[in-house]
Amino acid sequence: MEYFRPIPCETGRWRLAGGWARFSQFELLQRGVAPRVVDAAPEALLQTLTAPRPEVLGLSMAQPRIMGIVNATPDSFSDGGSYDGAAQGRRLAAAGAEILDVGGESTRPGAREVPEADEITRVVPVIASLRGLAAISVDTRKAGVARAAIAAGAGLVNDVSGFDFDPGLAQVVAESGLPVCLMHAQGIPETMQDDPSYGDVLLDVYDALAARIARAEAAGIPRARIVIDPGIGFGKTQAHNLAILRRISLYHGLGCAVLLGVSRKRFIGSIGGAEVAADRSAGTLAVTLAGVAQGIQIHRVHDAEETRQGLALWRAVTGGDK
């Protein structure tokens, strides 16, 4: 099978996904074959690559958006177990986060499942208290949690399992009429980092996301309401993460807005020499801006102020807002 990755270029002929990034050429990718640059791709794919993406939560996808991470959990990898979700969400919104992603179950490597009732108890009060400050998404794998979160004011469901964990979640999303983010993960948090393996991680994740989209569409969720996330750090080694990030523009070929979540991830600490998760904001921003250069629309981060500032300077220097 052939895959065509748009190669971002400042003076490119076409706009990527109707946004700020441009391209004129493609990298032709095939399993077991060396990549090569080509000047043409199938017309249907070109139309998909250039079509503007639908708004998400009322936000245009023609510019990068900041999603702030709100941990309503006592065991998140990044905050050392100290949390106040409502206060955290207010700080993120004030700092420039346009979406607040509220989660009540840690999905860090090795984390154990949280009972549904406990997860609901954690997220619903936080969502209710943040309603009106920014758009709200709920980070959950469970249908019951999503239903309660939607009733409290969540406008998007962010499922790290891509409907693998709870098949009933697809029906909840379909009936709600809300958008959903489908992430790729190999395995579950308890075991996903034990020994992840792929034939070709970039292409395997592409195919897996395509299958998740097809399953969502079959459940009654149109592609226009789907966001995709390649799942950096979820069942992937450092080498896997880097392989995806170097060519992440490939995923625009799936016809959905793309979300990138790299904030404070272990590979940033490993490469950047930052053992403590909270010390990884500079590395996070570097990877985030690399994703922006490849047209990635939504960036899920802990540090909204640093990201807002970085994006403002990126726009000023590159003309990325034109």
For the regions a language model picked out, list residue spans one by one:
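A short, charged/proline- and glycine-enriched loop
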Residues: 62-66
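Short acidic capping loops at alpha-helix termini that bridge into adjacent secondary structure
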Residues: 222-225
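Non-catalytic propeptide/linker segments at domain boundaries
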Residues: 32-60
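Active-site-adjacent loop and "lid" segments of alpha/beta metabolic enzymes
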Residues: 1-20, 30, 61, 76-91, ...
